Amino acid sequence: MLRSLFGRNRKRKGVGATGPAQDDSIRSVKVGDVLSIQGLALEYDDRYFYVEKIHRYANEADTWYELTCVDGDTHIWIDWTDGYDLLVTATDDPDPVGLGSIGLTEEQLIDLDEENSIDNFIAVDGERYDYRNSSEVAFYQDNRGEGQGLYLWDFLREDGERLLSISKWEGRPFEATFSEVIAPDSIKLYKGERTHPGSRRPK
């Protein structure tokens, strides 16, 4: 899960006074589109993924989206936020791990949340992950409905190339997931049908 990793509570950029321009970036993605992705560690450069689902997350400061993308039996999950900068992460691992697997405890997470300091960090498998944010979040499945609450902690690996997100849903154990930070221009979007006039699928 993804928010303002490189700064806390930064405001979203406004739309320019001249009106929105044609946007072929991930910002304009919709269910039914197709995308390709380059630069992911597991090398899917020659694969084309169908965007099957789009979920939305939001807290007081930011909104971000999670795409479920499929190509045959292969799934990838792409998160993106457009707060201060367009920031994108991706993973092909659907299975979270528990806190014990990464050497953390609930008490440590509570302390990190209360201290709320980006000077804090944790070590996972000998690698440093810097604390970036923690907050209560609303999850909107398929970008609809009233939303379901959860709590999230985000940590960014020291080199800025990997994100660790830890979530806590009511009635469920803590879940930790890893994803890879990728350049926004490494994703090429092939738009499907649009309901508004003048929209065409890029060649």
What function would you assign to each model-found segment?
Residues 1-203:
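Mixed-charge, low-complexity intrinsically disordered regions
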